[in-house]
From Swiss-Prot:
Residues given in the record as Mg(2+) binding sites: 193, 195-196
Protein name: Ribulose bisphosphate carboxylase large chain
Cofactor: Mg(2+)
Modified residues (N6-carboxylysine): 193
Class of this enzyme: lyase
Role noted for this protein: RuBisCO catalyzes two reactions: the carboxylation of D-ribulose 1,5-bisphosphate, the primary event in carbon dioxide fixation, as well as the oxidative fragmentation of the pentose substrate. Both reactions occur simultaneously and in competition at the same active site.
Tree of life domain: Bacteria
Enzyme active site: 167, 286
EC number(s) recorded for this UniProt protein: 4.1.1.39
């Protein structure tokens, strides 16, 4: 019997609330934390989120009869309480894969975090997690090189990589900037880095910076016999200008470039990642602006979602927080998104904030980057938390050394190697860290001076965005 059109407004839950639905392996699944307006039933507001983020609108429309609405609509299929917070609840929604353009995280996010976030029936809405089916993962390019290829390119194995963000982040001339890079690389760092807001300002145009930095890299490589790199930030006002800067970095022999993937845009990032893969370049990703989206525990996008988006869009490094430094980061939640960056399969684990199984197939992993207010005293905890497949990035913790940049780099190199050796010998880094560092400092005056300089520096503030579940 043909369907008939009934004009008017009906409740969302009549069409989009389907607790009997069993998600398909090909569905994209989303978990939202929903804070409804007072008096709005949970089922109605969950269905409204499903409708407004897929095929629905505020009224019935006759053009629904021209398509197979049952095939394309999003389905709210489950509701759960949020532990310890009765003002909100979790809504689980399944989206047919055919709703989304292949390989386009932009298209996925435009639907899932689009107009629905301004819906009046909601007081707040947060996208907590997404499950991308393997059928969709395979349409995405992913990291340009991946962890193993990067280690092979650099010929560095068995320890975390060491980096340093050049400070002051703004105001240095290109020549002095290159000098700071050289001193850090010569002292023992693997990488130095542009800060996220270093682009092409009047005090240091991008081409001048690239040239002086490459001179620093080549000189440090010749003196140390090690492969070195600097994250040259190619973020630009337009994607054409971004690609121009990337091409020049390749031309002068740079092994790695950098992009601010949120402020620069996901379309630009995907384009750049594909170019890096084609041209044998590594891609470092900064997450500038993430806290605007992810820090409010009731509204926005959780960082684990932004992590998944980056892995699909493409990047070889991603800033991940430190747990122990100056920036926000719950330990278990951080471990959860580190797993999302690196592992080929993530099992649902609510104790780490992971709501769905996630199969990445053969897609390479991303190196987590610990950066923000860290110094040598944090090294045992960082090595224990992040393991070998990571980048430990000390800006002030290198350049603030009382003897200068090279000494700061040497102190960090001695500290990381001492911690790795101690771990490999079965010692407990976070319990025995002070003894491990003190023993190493007996043979390293640079490390001893660093330990004395930062012995009282701590960042003991409570985390704003905590996991909603108890750690098991």
């Amino acid at each position: 019997m043909a369907k008939t059109y009934d004009a008017g407004v009906k409740e969302y839950r009549e069409t989009y609330w389907m607790p009997e639905y069993t998600p398909l392996d090909t569905d994209i699944l989303a978990c939202f934390k929903v804070t409804p307006q007072p008096g709005v039933p949970r089922e109605e507001v969950a269905a409204a989120v499903a409708a407004e983020s897929s095929t629905g609108t505020w009224t019935t429309v006759w053009t629904d009869l021209l398509t197979d609405l049952d095939h394309y609509k999003g389905r709210a299929y489950a509701i759960e309480d949020v532990p310890g917070d009765d003002t909100c609840f979790y809504a689980f929604i399944a989206y047919p894969i055919d709703l989304f353009e292949e390989g386009s995280v932009v298209n996925v996010m435009t639907s899932l975090v689009g107009n629905v976030f301004g819906f009046k029936a909601l007081r707040a809405l947060r996208l907590e997690d997404i499950r991308f089916p393997i059928a969709y993962v395979m349409t995405c390019n992913g990291p340009p090189q991946g962890i193993q290829v990067e280690r092979d390119l650099l010929n560095k194995y068995g320890r975390p990589l060491l980096g340093c963000t050049i400070k002051p982040k703004l105001g240095l001339s290109a020549k002095n900037y290159g000098r700071a890079c050289y001193e850090g690389l010569r002292g023992g760092l693997d990488f130095t880095k542009d800060d996220e807001n270093v682009n092409s300002q009047p005090f240091m145009r991008w081409r001048h910076r690239f040239d002086f930095v490459m001179e620093a890299i080549q000189k440090a490589e010749a003196e140390t016999g090690e492969r070195k790199g600097h994250y040259l930030n190619v973020t630009a006002p337009t994607s054409d200008e971004m690609m121009k800067r990337a091409e020049y970095a390749k031309e002068i022999g740079a092994p790695i470039i950098m992009h601010d993937y949120i402020t620069g845009g996901w379309s630009a990032n995907t384009q750049l990642a594909q170019w890096c893969q084609d041209n044998g370049m590594l891609l470092h990703i900064h997450r500038a602006m993430h806290a605007v989206l992810d820090r409010n525990p009731h509204h926005g996008i959780h960082f684990r979602v932004l992590t998944k988006i980056l892995r699909l869009s493409g990047g070889d490094h991603l800033h991940s927080g430190t747990v122990v430094g100056k920036l926000e980061g719950d330990r278990e939640a951080t471990l959860g998104w580190i797993d999302i960056m690196r592992d080929s399969f993530n099992k649902e684990d609510r104790s780490r904030g992971i709501f769905f199984d996630q199969d990445w197939g053969s897609m390479p992993g991303v190196l987590p980057v610990a950066s923000g207010g860290i110094h040598v005293w944090h090294m045992p905890a960082l090595v224990n938390i992040f393991g070998d497949d990571s980048v430990l990035q000390f800006g002030g913790g290198t350049l603030g050394h009382p003897w200068g940049n090279a000494a700061g780099a040497a102190a960090n190199r001695v500290a990381v190697e001492a911690c790795v050796e101690a771990r490999n010998n079965g010692r407990e880094l976070e319990k025995e860290g002070k003894e491990i560092l003190t023993t190493a400092a007996a043979h390293s005056p640079e490390l001893k001076a660093a330990m004395e300089t930062w012995k009282e520096i701590k960042f003991e503030f409570d985390t704003v965005d905590k996991l909603d579940v108890s750690h098991k």
